[in-house]
Design a protein with these regions (language model features):
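Conserved alpha-helical substructure of the radical SAM core
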Residues: 1-120, 131-142, 146-147, 153-154, ...
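A C-terminal junction/extension of Radical SAM enzymes
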Residues: 1-12, 155-159, 168-181, 185-244
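Conserved beta-strand segments of the P-loop GTPase G domain that flank and frequently precede/overlap
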Residues: 124, 161
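A glycine-centered beta->alpha junction motif in the catalytic cores
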Residues: 125-129
Length: 244
């Protein structure tokens, strides 16, 4: 008779863990933990995940992994392309969440050459135009949109992740139309993070221009995600994770 611990280990190998691969990020999103005074020691103690250690993690988990930084944007890991190369062709689902700004055409061409049909690129774009930069401080909307289209044209699954704020909630219907036109999946986020610019935990240099949305678009505890449009590539990506 198998032990409970054995069953637990078997189950754990089938989850997709989240990897915070480094401490690096070029942006200053006001609600991010990086912009809190309490996170600064953690950031200073952090380091870049080595390729050797990442290989061990990736080999252990059978279904894939997620790159969604809590104190980092994964694409700013200095060897992130090599991490993508490790994942390439292994028939595991890989999710990459990024702001997606600040990298060259050549960098993106190589990044998108890996994991076609296996990778899902989630771009944080909170609106249909430059208003997205009010939260993604330091990003360039036009550059990010270009990278999303570039990935789509190279066969990648592109997910448009849209946090709902007061200044973009009236544009949701138009965002859905655009997502369908561009063949992007659209994921709406009801945030559970605060809207107090005088929060004592905020760093003094935070540029807080956020406006709270209607109460129906906020959450008290855990954030809420709603798929407003699912592309055919997203549905194919889901099927990749189903093991016979």
């Amino acid at each position: 008779m198998p032990r409970i611990t054995d069953e637990y280990v078997i189950h754990q190998r089938k989850v997709r863990p989240n990897i915070d691969a480094s401490h690096r990020c070029a942006f200053r999103c006001p609600q991010c933990i990086r912009q809190k005074t309490i996170s600064q020691d953690q950031i200073r103690r952090s380091f870049d995940l080595s390729e050797e250690n990442f290989q061990k993690i990736f080999d252990y988990y059978t279904e894939g992994i997620t790159f969604c930084g809590q104190i980092s944007d994964p694409i700013y890991h200095p060897n992130f392309l090599n991490l993508l190369k490790i994942c390439n062709g292994q028939r595991k689902r890989v999710r990459i969440a990024t702001v997606g700004s600040g990298k060259s055409d050549a960098w993106w061409d190589e990044a998108y050459s890996y994991g076609v049909g296996e990778n899902a690129w989630y771009f944080g774009v909170d609106g249909i135009d430059e208003k997205s930069e009010l939260y993604r401080v330091g990003s360039n909307f036009q550059d990010v949109w270009k990278r999303m289209r570039q990935g789509r044209d190279l066969g990648q699954l592109i997910v448009w992740q849209y946090i709902i704020f007061g200044y973009n909630e009236h544009e949701i219907d138009r965002a859905i139309e655009i997502a369908k036109e561009e063949d992007f999946s659209l994921l709406l986020i009801n945030t559970n993070r605060g809207f107090n610019p005088n929060n004592r935990l905020l760093r003094s240099n935070v540029d807080f221009q956020l406006t709270s949305p209607d109460k129906k678009h906020t959450q008290e505890r855990v954030k809420k995600e709603l798929w407003a449009h699912k592309s055919s590539r997203l549905l194919e990506w889901y099927r990749l994770g189903r093991r016979d």
